[in-house]
């Protein structure tokens, strides 16, 4: 079994660690760095629970080896909190009851955080477009409507639509 020293950035912090060449990125984040917000569900990249941001884009950490992250930037759900307080998207999930058991929540948050900050031309006032956006993240509990309500409450599209209704 071979091991490698990898250097990467995780949540803005430079990290250098020795890892086994077969260690999955999800396991490295959870076991080595103790960032347990990233969940592992299906271990096949289907459920989306392990979604992180890899160089700014959503990626399934259960499908990547830790050594593949060498020289790259990783952002996990822990980075969404601001000074120990919930970030806006996390707060919206809390207020709109966008979670029940919470297992899928980190992956959904990382997907949605990316979508809100990237220029994807998504109409966040459209349930259909939001459902399409989160179709790669499976949730057994909520039925998705409260997740949709949460994303609508923080999206710029919704804020623009609300202000146009007032005019």
Curated annotation (Swiss-Prot):
Q: How does activity depend on temperature?
A: The caffeine dehydrogenase activity increases linearly from 25 to at least 66 degrees Celsius. An incubation of 30 minutes at 70 degrees Celsius drastically reduces the enzyme activity to 11% of the initial value, and 77% of the activity remains after 30 minutes of incubation at 42 degrees Celsius.
| EC main group | oxidoreductase
The UniProt record gives the binding positions of [2Fe-2S] cluster as 42, 47, 50, 62
Keyword Isomerase in record: no
Under Enzyme Commission nomenclature, its number is: 1.17.5.2
Give the record's keywords alphabetically. Answer: 2Fe-2S, Iron, Iron-sulfur, Metal-binding, Oxidoreductase
* Matches recorded under InterPro entries: 2Fe-2S-bd, 2Fe-2S-bd_dom_sf, 2Fe-2S_ferredoxin-like_sf, 2Fe-2S_ferredoxin-type, 2Fe2S_fd_BS, Beta-grasp_dom_sf, Diverse_Oxidoreductases
Segments forming domain 2Fe-2S ferredoxin-type: 4-80
MF terms in GO: 2 iron, 2 sulfur cluster binding; caffeine oxidase activity; metal ion binding; oxidoreductase activity
Q: Name one Pfam family in it.
A: Fer2
**Catalysed reaction per UniProt?**
caffeine + a ubiquinone + H2O = 1,3,7-trimethylurate + a ubiquinol; ubiquinone-0 + caffeine + H2O = ubiquinol-0 + 1,3,7-trimethylurate; theobromine + a ubiquinone + H2O = 3,7-dimethylurate + a ubiquinol
> What is recorded on activity versus pH?
Optimum pH is 7.0.
Quaternary organization: Heterotrimer composed of an alpha (CdhA), a beta (CdhB) and a gamma (CdhC) subunit.
Functional summary from the UniProt entry: Coenzyme Q0 (ubiquinone-0) is the preferred electron acceptor and, to a lesser extent, coenzyme Q2 (ubiquinone-2) can also be used, but oxygen and NAD(P)(+) cannot. Is involved in a caffeine degradation pathway that allows Pseudomonas sp. strain CBB1 to grow on caffeine as the sole carbon and nitrogen source.
Protein name stated in the entry? Caffeine dehydrogenase subunit gamma
Gene symbol here is cdhC
């Amino acid at each position: 079994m071979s091991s490698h020293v990898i250097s990467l950035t995780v949540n803005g912090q430079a990290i250098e660690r020795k890892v086994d060449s077969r260690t999955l990125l999800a396991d490295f984040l959870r076991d080595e760095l103790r960032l347990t917000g990233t969940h592992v569900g299906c271990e096949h990249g289907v459920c989306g629970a392990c979604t992180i941001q890899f160089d700014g884009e959503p990626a399934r950490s259960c499908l990547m080896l830790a050594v593949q992250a060498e020289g790259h930037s990783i952002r996990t759900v822990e980075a969404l909190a601001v000074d120990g307080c919930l970030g806006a998207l996390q707060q919206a999930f809390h207020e709109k009851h966008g979670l029940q058991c919470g297992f899928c929540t980190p992956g959904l948050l990382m997907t949605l955080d990316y979508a809100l900050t990237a220029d994807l031309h998504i109409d966040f006032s459209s349930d259909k477009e939001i459902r399409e956006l989160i179709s790669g993240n499976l949730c057994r509990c909520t039925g998705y409507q409260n997740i949709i309500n949460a994303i609508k409450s923080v999206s710029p599209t919704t804020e623009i639509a609300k202000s146009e209704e007032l005019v």
